[in-house]
């Protein structure tokens, strides 16, 4: 730079202080983020750190996706400087230790150089990465430093009028007009550039800031910008075995075991009691899964009747088959085991997906503390903790309606109070019909609403204020009892599949369990009881209930939509839907037909013009030939002849 203001030698721009020990600060806060979906919401915190002192100058948190969480960050220059600059010329009095120094600092320009991408000759932390002119990429100076590739821009903010000589309102000068907390009167505004919004922020990034002075060395400070990401609504597996993603393909459909009619007692069997009811039969696969969908429909129809006017309820073929919603509730203490602590109500299955925050008991590890709104420690003694109606304890050892404090005190087990909901997804009819018609194009996959999202928290009053039935009425209704009964029946059937393989590895048992569930849904699909939508088995439901023959209902609805679509078309548009080869035929012969039509329209005119042109040329040629056979006679004037005579 040729300007006199930039003519200071490089050695004057370098402060004679030793190297900074900042590697630990640079490494400590970065963490990579694994993105599952571009639409997933995170809790993003941006932190600006003064690397000279290690203090935080700004920490701003907001909720959003990874593509739109780039806010403006407001802080003060003195937050990056501390009490004073590391200045070789302290007699000048710049810095932030005194009101006068803060006021003088406000009068100077500043420039910023990136440390995350250091250009050749720009130096290191000692020079603030500004070892020569041209390294600066942003700042507030009269030459307006800028860059098209740096990640941020840093400018001065608006200083209120009458702010005064930067007095600190927290000390004795608080009564002076214009005093501010900490005497901050050098506001800065940090904005992200387009390059910064596209960059990876998995690790902290560093910049150097220098105060521009026409005489003397330019003081240096260093700061870093870090992004910290926390997942909102964590889905944390509870239990020793996480979800196994690999699933074996189904080999054969599962047969439904129909109940056999009771046989008459054999003659001479005096021990048989006449008129005794036959032993109860467990429901078959079809009945068990249909009861699960029916119970989900009844609970949804009770709480949100507007959503069940016409909808599709789908069972997923892959794990997890159940979801837990952590809730807060009041459990009851019992000195002896209550009736619901029987062996039949205990389940060895663990939940692989739990959302929300609720009541936790026991030694909860740090990996699962995000599920806890309140954590209670068990006291000494032997008693039982029974979960409220409609809830269950999800423990690291399995599902149970009641806890034994003796077991909790002797082991490292922990439990979370949850509502248990089957993994039933809710789809609108337009989405389902569009998938089968393959006409509707979605820019992105619609968010799947599950029963846990629609009804989660109702039993404990989480969203019961908007439900006319109320919390108590919902738990006590027959619809909710029907869903709970279907859940316990299905859990019992799933657990039997695992218990039959207890002698094998637990992971192998879960693989077989997943295969069994896929076979069950395959049987329903092959029987026409449900419609296969991707990896889900969907049942049609309206205000009349769940339709057993869902495939027939799907075909009926698709035919109705096709007729309605055709009735709204004109006769010309309808031609292309009558035959599959009609469109191909038209597109094939349309080109030659258009060319032939153009020839017939403009051909005669072009031909006439061509013939006339040829005739004109021939006439000219004939005239030339005739003129070559004759010569022009010399003209004689009669008066000249008479004069000669």
UniProtKB/Swiss-Prot annotation:
Entry's transmembrane regions: 586-606
Motif YXXL motif: positions: 630-633
Region (Fusion peptide): 447-467
Disulfide bonds: 113-130, 122-135, 311-314, 311-538, 341-395, 360-372, 402-415, 530-537
Gene (UniProt): env
Posttranslational mods: Specific enzymatic cleavages in vivo yield mature proteins. Envelope glycoproteins are synthesized as an inactive precursor that is N-glycosylated and processed likely by host cell furin or by a furin-like protease in the Golgi to yield the mature SU and TM proteins. The cleavage site between SU and TM requires the minimal sequence [KR]-X-[KR]-R. The R-peptide is released from the C-terminus of the cytoplasmic tail of the TM protein upon particle formation as a result of proteolytic cleavage by the viral protease. Cleavage of this peptide is required for TM to become fusogenic.
SUPFAM superfamilies xrefs: ENV polyprotein, receptor-binding domain, Virus ectodomain
Protein name, as recorded: Envelope glycoprotein
Positions of region (Receptor-binding domain (RBD)): 32-237
Entry keyword annotation includes Phosphoprotein: no
Annotated motif CXXC, positions: 311-314
InterPro entries given in the database record: FMuLV_rcpt-bd (IPR008981), TLV/ENV_coat_polyprotein (IPR018154)
Quaternary structure and interacting proteins, as annotated: The mature envelope protein (Env) consists of a trimer of SU-TM heterodimers attached by a labile interchain disulfide bond. The activated Env consists of SU monomers and TM trimers.
Topological domain ranges for the Cytoplasmic compartment: 607-640
Gene3D superfamilies membership: 1.10.287.210, ENV polyprotein, receptor-binding domain
Region Disordered, residue ranges: 259-286
Organism per entry: Xenotropic MuLV-related virus (isolate VP42) (XMRV)
Stretches of the chain found on the membrane's Extracellular side: 34-585
């Amino acid at each position: 730079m040729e300007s006199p203001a930039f003519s200071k030698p490089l050695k004057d721009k370098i402060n004679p202080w030793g190297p900074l020990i900042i590697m630990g600060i640079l490494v400590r806060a970065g963490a990579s983020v694994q993105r599952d979906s571009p639409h997933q919401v995170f809790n993003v915190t941006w932190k600006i750190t003064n690397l000279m002192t290690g203090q935080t100058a700004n920490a701003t948190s907001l909720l959003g996706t990874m593509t739109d969480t780039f806010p403006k960050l407001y802080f003060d220059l003195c937050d990056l400087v501390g009490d004073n600059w590391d200045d070789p010329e302290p007699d000048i009095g710049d810095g932030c230790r005194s009101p006068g120094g803060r006021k003088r600092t406000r009068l100077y320009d500043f420039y910023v150089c990136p440390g995350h991408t250091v250009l050749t000759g720009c130096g290191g932390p000692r020079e603030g990465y500004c070892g020569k002119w041209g390294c600066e990429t942003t700042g507030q100076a009269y030459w307006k430093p800028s860059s098209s590739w740096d990640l941020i821009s840093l400018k001065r903010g608006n200083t209120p009028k009458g702010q005064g000589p930067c007095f600190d309102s927290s000390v004795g000068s608080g009564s002076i007009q214009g005093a501010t907390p900490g005497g901050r009167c050098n506001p800065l505004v940090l904005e992200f550039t387009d390059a910064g919004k596209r960059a990876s922020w998995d690790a902290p990034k560093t910049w150097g800031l220098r105060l521009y002075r026409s005489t003397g060395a330019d003081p240096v400070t260093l700061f870093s910008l870090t992004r910290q990401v926390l997942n909102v609504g964590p889905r944390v597996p509870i239990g020793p075995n996480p979800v196994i993603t690999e699933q074996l393909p189904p080999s054969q459909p599962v047969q439904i075991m129909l109940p056999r009619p009771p046989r008459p007692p054999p003659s001479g069997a005096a021990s048989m009691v006449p008129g005794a009811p036959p032993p109860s039969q467990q429901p078959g696969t079809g009945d068990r899964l249909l009861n699960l969908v029916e119970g989900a429909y009844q609970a949804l129809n009770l709480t949100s009747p507007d959503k069940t006017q016409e909808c599709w309820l789908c069972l997923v073929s892959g794990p997890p088959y159940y979801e837990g919603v952590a809730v807060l509730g009041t459990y009851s203490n019992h000195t002896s085991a209550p009736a619901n602590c029987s062996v039949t109500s205990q389940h060895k299955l663990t939940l692989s997906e739990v959302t929300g925050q609720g009541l936790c008991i026991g030694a909860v590890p740090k990996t699962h503390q995000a599920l806890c709104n309140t954590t209670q420690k068990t006291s000494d003694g032997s008693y039982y903790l029974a979960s409220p109606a409609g809830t269950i304890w999800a423990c690291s050892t399995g599902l149970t309606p009641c806890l034994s404090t003796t077991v909790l005190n002797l082991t490292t087990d922990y439990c979370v109070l949850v509502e248990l909901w089957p993994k039933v997804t809710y789809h609108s009819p337009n989405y389902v019909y569009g998938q089968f018609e393959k006409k509707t194009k979605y820019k992105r996959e619609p968010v799947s609403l599950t029963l846990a999202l629609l009804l989660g928290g109702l039993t404990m009053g989480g969203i019961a204020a908007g439900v006319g039935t109320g919390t108590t009425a919902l738990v006590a209704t027959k619809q909710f009892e029907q869903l709970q009964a279907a859940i316990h029946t299905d859990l019992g059937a799933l657990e039997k599949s695992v218990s039959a393989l207890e002698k094998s590895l637990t992971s192998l048992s879960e693989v077989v369990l997943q295969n069994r569930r896929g076979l069950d849904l395959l049987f329903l699909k092959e029987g026409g009881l449900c419609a296969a939508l991707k990896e889900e088995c969907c049942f049609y439901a309206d205000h009349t209930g769940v339709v057993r023959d869902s495939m027939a209902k799907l075909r009926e609805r698709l035919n109705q939509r096709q007729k309605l679509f055709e009735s709204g078309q004109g006769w010309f548009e309808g031609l292309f839907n009558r035959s599959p080869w009609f469109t191909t035929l038209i597109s094939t012969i349309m080109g030659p037909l258009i060319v032939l039509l153009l020839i017939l329209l403009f051909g005669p005119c072009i031909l006439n013009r061509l013939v006339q042109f040829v005739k004109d040329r021939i006439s000219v040629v004939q005239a030339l030939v005739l003129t070559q056979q004759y010569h022009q006679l010399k003209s004689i004037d009669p008066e000249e002849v008479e004069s000669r005579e």
